[in-house]
């Protein structure tokens, strides 16, 4: 099985990149792709850059060049669901854009034309993540992850997202774009993120402080998933 792994920032991929054996590195269009093996699994690890366009472009290159059987998105996220703490892990059941609005033409909030109302994560991968988390005693929350080209750093913006997407458990800036590309290419995907902040007025300071912890937690989960595939 070939596994594609996508992270936006260097800090979010560096642990996994350091574990790749027989490594080949490709730099293309601002993206970096590390190819090789982790735990006898053939992997391609993409550092896409931040935001929806960078994530979509990088994921498209990853799928075209490497042709993975599945895609895992890893990294950090802002926690929204009640009780989530820094370092906790979230897994997607579905993803939507919190900054997309074509409701004037009858689409659901967060839905784009020619796309489903939400991008559904692969149920088998979601279940696998849940089982691994349970075995490892990891606090895991599954549910809707919302993406947009904004770092949410105010209580007002967070309240708006929660009001319009009441099932949201976490927010970030790339997952739905990755999911959209995987949907178009018919590639199973799942999002595994660790919480770095809680999206309030202190989010930027929390993010800077706890990004390394979130990156370590999400990378650890990805490694455990690779062991279980």
UniProtKB/Swiss-Prot annotation:
GO molecular function: adenosylhomocysteine nucleosidase activity; methylthioadenosine nucleosidase activity
Catalytic activity: S-adenosyl-L-homocysteine + H2O = S-(5-deoxy-D-ribos-5-yl)-L-homocysteine + adenine; S-methyl-5'-thioadenosine + H2O = 5-(methylsulfanyl)-D-ribose + adenine; 5'-deoxyadenosine + H2O = 5-deoxy-D-ribose + adenine
Gene3D superfamilies: Nucleoside phosphorylase domain
Enzyme class: hydrolase
GO biological process: L-methionine salvage from methylthioadenosine; L-methionine salvage from S-adenosylmethionine; nucleoside catabolic process
InterPro entries found in the cross-reference section: MTA_SAH_Nsdase, Nucleoside_phosphorylase_d, Nucleoside_phosphorylase_sf
Entry binding sites for substrate: 78, 152, 173-174
Enzyme nomenclature, EC number: 3.2.2.9
Keywords associated with the record: Amino-acid biosynthesis, Hydrolase, Methionine biosynthesis
Any one cellular-component term (Gene Ontology): cytosol
Pathway: Amino-acid biosynthesis; L-methionine biosynthesis via salvage pathway; S-methyl-5-thio-alpha-D-ribose 1-phosphate from S-methyl-5'-thioadenosine (hydrolase route): step 1/2
Active site: residue positions: 12, 197
Family to which the UniProt record says this protein belongs: Belongs to the PNP/UDP phosphorylase family. MtnN subfamily.
Task performed by this protein: Catalyzes the irreversible cleavage of the glycosidic bond in both 5'-methylthioadenosine (MTA) and S-adenosylhomocysteine (SAH/AdoHcy) to adenine and the corresponding thioribose, 5'-methylthioribose and S-ribosylhomocysteine, respectively. Also cleaves 5'-deoxyadenosine, a toxic by-product of radical S-adenosylmethionine (SAM) enzymes, into 5-deoxyribose and adenine.
Record-given protein name: 5'-methylthioadenosine/S-adenosylhomocysteine nucleosidase
Species of provenance: Histophilus somni (strain 129Pt)
Gene: mtnN
């Amino acid at each position: 099985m070939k596994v594609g792994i996508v992270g936006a920032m260097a800090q979010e991929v560096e642990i996994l990149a350091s574990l790749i054996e027989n490594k080949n590195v490709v730099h293309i269009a601002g993206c970096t792709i590390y190819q090789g093996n982790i735990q006898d699994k053939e992997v391609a690890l993409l550092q896409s850059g931040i935001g929806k366009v960078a994530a979509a472009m990088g994921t498209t290159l990853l799928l075209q060049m490497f042709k993975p059987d599945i895609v895992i998105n890893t990294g950090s996220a802002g926690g929204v669901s009640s009780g989530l703490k820094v370092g906790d892990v979230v897994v997607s059941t579905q993803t939507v854009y919190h900054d997309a609005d074509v409701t004037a033409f009858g689409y659901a909030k967060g839905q784009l034309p020619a796309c489903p109302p939400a991008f559904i994560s692969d149920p088998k991968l979601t279940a696998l993540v849940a089982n691994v988390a349970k075995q490892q005693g990891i606090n895991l929350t599954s549910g809707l992850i919302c993406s947009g080209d904004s770092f949410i750093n105010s209580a007002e913006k967070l309240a708006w997202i929660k009001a319009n997407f009441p099932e949201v458990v976490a927010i970030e800036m790339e997952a739905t774009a990755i999911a959209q590309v995987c949907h178009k290419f018919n590639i199973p995907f799942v999002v595994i993120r660790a919480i770095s902040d809680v999206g309030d007025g202190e989010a930027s300071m929390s993010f800077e402080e706890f990004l390394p912890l979130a990156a370590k937690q999400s990378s650890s989960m990805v490694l455990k998933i690779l062991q279980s595939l």
